[in-house]
Amino acid sequence: MNEIHQPLARRVWRSNVDEEMARMAECLKRFPLIAFDTEYPGIIFRTYFDSSSDECYRAMKGNVENTKLIQCGFTLFNAKGEIGGVWEINFSNFGDPSDTRNELSIEFLRRHGLDLQKIRDEGVDMFGYGFFPKLMTVFRSQKHVEFVTFQGAYDFAYFLSILNHGKLPETHGEFATEVVKVFGQVYDTKVMAGFCEGLGEHLGLSKLAQLLQITRVGRAHHAGSDSLMTALVFIKLKHVYEDSRFARGLIYGIGKSNLVAAPAPAPVPEPTLPLMCQQNVASYPVFHNGYVQNYEQPQLVSYDPSGAPWAFCNATGTYVQLTHLPASTFAYPSQTPSATVDYLGPVPNYYNNNACYVVE
């Protein structure tokens, strides 16, 4: 696949929204995978490295409920990696002097070419037009669709907030339930990249696409172009995992142990991409400092004379085989720390508290 020939985003305004909605509905019949991205006026309520999961969710809820969406981008594609179309919807609702915003974020968007005045003058009134309810009617007209994001917590949150008259659920557990109820099967490419050695969760979308040798079409930080990059990254990462069910329902970006329910991870096949994307299949990933991720205590990994991996548990001062580590060692931390598991598949190379968020 040659990304240079991927389509430019179709820009949607008040004047052509009906035509483009019909075009999108027709395209969806053959391209049922939906990558999407949002652009919004920045973060007002911030969290810190040691913020709890509840604090992280409350901050996101406050940010989403108190700001207005500027753009939403959608790329429709299929399991073969073929792109059906790219749409960039501009919304007129942001722009009043009283609208909450982060001025640094607004200047950032302007520097990347967003014409906020044109969007204000010619964009779609998302509430007056009822864009998102109509869009969900289009999506639900198909029996099976899947949604793909990059660091998608805020993307899903804005979508849900608009559908729910500006409000999000009170808890992250209720939020997860709503995501499953409304969207069904969801994937986050930042989570998927965290399973690939040499990629990891520190990468932004543009850098990740560059490492995967994907050529950008359009400008970064425009919702249409970013949704296309998200789709192309997903297609490339699917080459690593023939069965991507292990990443289904994981959303990146809301705290460090946002577990709602942890299904048994699906088996992950051997990868087919270069070493840069090889998985840590044989054991838990060993970071450069010799530690394995654990939200409670880091675990020092060593090997016995036969080469079998063992882990020194700082909490107990004893050695245990990796196959019998507490479930809290996993990216899917257990509600019961004493539980044991036998899964030796890959876990994300996460280094900070923005771990994946399980929504199924």
Swiss-Prot record:
MF GO annotations: metal ion binding; poly(A)-specific ribonuclease activity; RNA binding
Annotated residues for binding of a divalent metal cation: D37, E39, D155, D226
Keywords: Cytoplasm, Exonuclease, Hydrolase, Metal-binding, Nuclease, Nucleus, RNA-binding, Transcription, Transcription regulation
Catalytic activity: Exonucleolytic cleavage of poly(A) to 5'-AMP
Residue ranges crossing the lipid bilayer per the database entry: none
Entry keyword ATP-binding: no
Family listed: Belongs to the CAF1 family.
Function: Ubiquitous transcription factor required for a diverse set of processes. It is a component of the CCR4 complex involved in the control of gene expression.
Protein name: Probable CCR4-associated factor 1 homolog 1
Species per Swiss-Prot/TrEMBL record: Arabidopsis thaliana
Gene designation: CAF1-1
